[in-house]
Amino acid sequence: MAKPTRKRRVKKNIESGIAHIHATFNNTIVMITDVHGNAIAWSSAGALGFKGSRKSTPFAAQMASEAAAKSAQEHGLKTVEVTVKGPGSGRESAIRALAAAGLEVTAIRDVTPVPHNGARPPKRRRV
């Protein structure tokens, strides 16, 4: 039987892009796209092996940001605009990690969706 051919990853030469940070209460997902929204690199706390409540920590968000930035820099990325969505604890540390990884952060935008009194929120937890 013939070996399945593996598709070679094409190295894209992209100078600037957008880093989308989705910080939920349970996880942090970092996706880096070009200006048109095509994905270049992504990472998340769960994909790096953090499980359970450790996924929601700022440290896990920092590691996810570093991994995504490293992968994006292989495609020639140098500057990013950051869009942050969600109320999670990894918002600040993810942005700092992108800058520390060598990407120049040009703008930070908060795009957290705010309902105009839409769906009823979940009931309060009693622990």
Curated annotation (Swiss-Prot):
GO molecular function terms listed in the Swiss-Prot or TrEMBL record: rRNA binding; structural constituent of ribosome
Gene Ontology cellular component list: ribonucleoprotein complex; ribosome
Keyword Ribosomal protein in record: yes
Keywords, comma-separated and alphabetical: Ribonucleoprotein, Ribosomal protein, RNA-binding, rRNA-binding
Pfam families from the UniProt entry: Ribosomal_S11
Span of the signal peptide: none
Coiled-coil stretches: none
Organism domain of life: Bacteria
InterPro entries on file: Ribosomal_uS11 (IPR001971), Ribosomal_uS11_bac-type (IPR019981), Ribosomal_uS11_CS (IPR018102), Ribosomal_uS11_sf (IPR036967)
GO biological process, one term: translation
Assembly and oligomerization: Part of the 30S ribosomal subunit. Interacts with proteins S7 and S18. Binds to IF-3.
Family affiliation: Belongs to the universal ribosomal protein uS11 family.
Biological role stated in the UniProt entry: Located on the platform of the 30S subunit, it bridges several disparate RNA helices of the 16S rRNA. Forms part of the Shine-Dalgarno cleft in the 70S ribosome.
Protein's name in the database: Small ribosomal subunit protein uS11
Species per Swiss-Prot/TrEMBL record: Streptococcus suis (strain 05ZYH33)
Lineage start: Bacteria, Bacillati, Bacillota, Bacilli, Lactobacillales
